[in-house]
């Protein structure tokens, strides 16, 4: 059983970003919160919206930072420090250029080119040992097109594929919390759209 106490969904705040690929982490967190009937509420001391859920008797905090993506670590560090949550007890969901839409994968630690993840690493004392949920949004092909791609809205087909991966990721997060990472990975990593 994974000892996750905080689940974070990354995105940019505001209605203009709500439906962009860069907010796939927020989409996941909203889906998880809806599944557990736990509305996210503004919490200024944590620079975001928070909720509490219980899975298999475990008390878990949900956090959507309302800072911009590249300042996500401010919110994560504030909540983690307040509740004495270690990096190894955190799951961070975010958009991943290197995976196609419809694919989501867990990864423990390591580096990332995702700005929100990099800021979390920096704010957590350069500790990279938190669990990541990488939600595929696809790569536009050339690095000069990345910003427009992540800040753009997915096509209807891409959106359906991303939502399918998120639905499966919510189910697998339950497996992660009730059983273990290996079982959750095996199921999530074999998901096909």
From Swiss-Prot:
Keyword S-adenosyl-L-methionine: no
Alphabetized Pfam families for the sequence: Pept_tRNA_hydro
Catalytic reaction(s) noted: an N-acyl-L-alpha-aminoacyl-tRNA + H2O = an N-acyl-L-amino acid + a tRNA + H(+)
Annotated site residues (Discriminates between blocked and unblocked aminoacyl-tRNA) in this chain: 12
Binding site for tRNA: 17, 68, 70, 115
Major localization listed first in the record, in broad terms: cytoplasm
PROSITE patterns for this protein: PEPT_TRNA_HYDROL_1 (PS01195)
Keyword Endoplasmic reticulum belongs to the record: no
Subcellular location: Cytoplasm
Disulfide bridge partners, by residue number: none
Active site: 22 (proton acceptor)
GO cellular component: cytoplasm
Molecular function per GO: peptidyl-tRNA hydrolase activity; tRNA binding
CDD domains associated with the record: PTH (cd00462)
Single biological process term from Gene Ontology: rescue of stalled ribosome
Enzyme Commission number(s): 3.1.1.29
Subunit structure: Monomer.
Functional description taken from the UniProt entry: Hydrolyzes ribosome-free peptidyl-tRNAs (with 1 or more amino acids incorporated), which drop off the ribosome during protein synthesis, or as a result of ribosome stalling. Catalyzes the release of premature peptidyl moieties from peptidyl-tRNA molecules trapped in stalled 50S ribosomal subunits, and thus maintains levels of free tRNAs and 50S ribosomes.
Similarity comment: Belongs to the PTH family.
Name of the protein in question: Peptidyl-tRNA hydrolase
């Amino acid at each position: 059983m994974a000892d996750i106490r905080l689940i974070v969904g990354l995105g940019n705040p505001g209605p203009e970003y709500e439906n962009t690929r860069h907010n796939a982490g927020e989409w996941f967190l909203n889906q998880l919160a809806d599944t557990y009937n736990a509305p996210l509420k503004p919490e200024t001391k944590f620079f975001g919206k928070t909720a509490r859920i219980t899975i298999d008797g475990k008390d878990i905090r949900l956090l959507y930072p309302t800072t911009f993506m590249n300042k996500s670590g401010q919110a994560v560090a504030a909540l983690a420090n307040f509740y004495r949550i270690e990096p190894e007890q955190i799951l961070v969901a975010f958009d991943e250029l290197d995976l196609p839409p419809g694919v989501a994968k867990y990864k423990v630690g390591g580096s990332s080119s995702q700005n929100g993840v990099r800021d979390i690493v920096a704010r957590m004392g350069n500790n990279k040992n938190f669990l990541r949920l990488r939600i595929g949004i696809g790569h536009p092909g050339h690095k000069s097109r990345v910003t427009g791609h992540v800040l753009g809205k997915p096509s209807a087909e891409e959106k359906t594929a991303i939502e399918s991966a998120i639905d499966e990721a919510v189910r697998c997060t339950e497996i992660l919390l009730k059983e273990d990472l290996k079982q959750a990975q095996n199921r999530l990593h074999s998901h096909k759209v």
